[in-house]
Curated annotation (Swiss-Prot):
GO biological process: ribosomal small subunit assembly; translation
Membrane-spanning intervals of the chain: none
Function as written in the Swiss-Prot or TrEMBL entry: Required for maturation of 30S ribosomal subunits.
GO cellular component term, pick one: cytosol
Keyword match Oxidoreductase: no
Family to which this protein belongs: Belongs to the RimP family.
Primary residence: cytoplasm
Gene label: rimP
Listed name of the protein: Ribosome maturation factor RimP
Length: 160
């Protein structure tokens, strides 16, 4: 798949620059290559980061000519309600509220919202809103993302 090839191609350059490629998606019409990045140093991605990354990746993509014809390159941060793409992301966001959609239902549900309270191997434990917990195998997670909460809002706005 083209998205996977692009991610594989640009990941070494991203790592050298201190970035992690979160997601790559190529839209054929209009031709747009969208790349979502994060920083390894835990700082927030800013406009300058996107500009630096874009210039470096453009050079790599142009040399490899992996995308035929002209296209628009869009680089952005993962954002507040970012997707969790790998087990490393779950570890990084321990204590955060997330929404998960599962491949196979647990207790007849395929969707849960809860706080990541523990990670042991491939097992992720969520504290659910009804004060119960659920253990989910990482391989059973289809999609996961951070949920923007009132507490996050208070943290962001406390210095304003």
């Amino acid at each position: 798949m083209l998205n996977d090839k692009i991610k594989e191609l640009i990941t070494p350059t991203a790592k050298t620059l201190g970035y992690k490629v979160i997601n790559v998606s190529f839209i054929v019409k209009p031709a747009i290559l969208k790349i979502v990045i994060d920083r390894f140093d835990e700082k927030k991605v800013n406009v300058l980061d996107c500009q630096v990354f874009s210039k470096a990746i453009s050079a790599v993509l142009d040399v490899e000519n992996i995308i035929p014809g002209k296209y628009f390159l869009e680089v952005e941060s993962a954002g507040i309600e970012r997707s969790l793409m790998d087990l490393e992301d779950f570890i990084k966001f321990l204590g955060y509220t997330i929404q998960v959609k599962l491949v196979a239902a647990i207790n007849e549900n395929k969707k849960y919202i809860g706080v990541i309270s523990n990670i042991k191997g491939q097992e992720i434990t969520l504290n659910l809103q009804n004060d119960s917990t659920i253990a989910i195998d990482y391989d059973n997670i289809k999609v996961a993302k951070i949920v923007f909460t009132d507490e996050m809002f208070r943290q962001i706005t406390k210095n304003y």
